[in-house]
Structures are given as structure tokens and as C-alpha cells.
């Protein structure tokens, strides 16, 4: 394999993982902030707030794992020159 293609694949894969990790961290932080603010405002609504929070965090983490799959595609399925 051409070293330029391999280097580009590894750099692209690293950028994909970095963007996914940063995005997932920001998304989880925003969701957690909203949960804490909602519980602080209405403590009796804590039970109703946890379900949408966990669904949101699950969707954010699913997007991260989709990024992981694309990274694996770019790094391990690069064309052979």
C-alpha cells in the first residue's frame, strides 16, 4: 500500500474519532446539565426526567459508535494501490 494513502487513512480515522468523542462529550454534558437543572427546578419530577435523559445519552453514544464504524472503514478498507 502506498504510504501516502495509509497516512491519509490513519489521519482521517483519527480526525473522525476525535470529532465523535468531542461531540459525544458535549452532547452528554448538555443533556446532563438539562437533567440537573430540571431536577433542581422540580425535584418531584426526577422520575419522569431520567427516562428522556437516558434515551438522549443512548442516542448520542450511538452516534459515536457510528463514527467508530466509519473510522474502521476508512482505516482498514483503504484501497490498495
From Swiss-Prot:
- Domain of life according to the entry: Bacteria
Q: Which InterPro entries does the annotation name?
A: ATP_synth_csu_bac/chlpt (IPR005953), ATP_synth_F0_csu (IPR000454), ATP_synth_F0_csu_DDCD_BS (IPR020537), ATP_synth_F0_csu_sf (IPR038662), ATPase_proteolipid_c-like_dom (IPR002379), F/V-ATP_Csub_sf (IPR035921)
Enumerate the subcellular locations listed in this protein's record, separating them with semicolons.
Cell membrane
Q: What GO molecular function terms would the record report?
A: lipid binding; proton-transporting ATP synthase activity, rotational mechanism
- SUBUNIT field: F-type ATPases have 2 components, F(1) - the catalytic core - and F(0) - the membrane proton channel. F(1) has five subunits: alpha(3), beta(3), gamma(1), delta(1), epsilon(1). F(0) has three main subunits: a(1), b(2) and c(10-14). The alpha and beta chains form an alternating ring which encloses part of the gamma chain. F(1) is attached to F(0) by a central stalk formed by the gamma and epsilon chains, while a peripheral stalk is formed by the delta and b chains.
Q: Which NCBIfam families match?
A: ATP_synt_c (TIGR01260), PRK05880.1 (NF004532)
Q: What's this protein's function?
A: F(1)F(0) ATP synthase produces ATP from ADP in the presence of a proton or sodium gradient. F-type ATPases consist of two structural domains, F(1) containing the extramembraneous catalytic core and F(0) containing the membrane proton channel, linked together by a central stalk and a peripheral stalk. During catalysis, ATP synthesis in the catalytic domain of F(1) is coupled via a rotary mechanism of the central stalk subunits to proton translocation. Key component of the F(0) channel; it plays a direct role in translocation across the membrane. A homomeric c-ring of between 10-14 subunits forms the central stalk rotor element with the F(1) delta and epsilon subunits.
Q: Give the protein name, as stated in the record.
A: ATP synthase subunit c
Q: What is the lineage of its organism?
A: Bacteria, Bacillati, Actinomycetota, Actinomycetes, Mycobacteriales
- Gene name for this UniProt entry: atpE
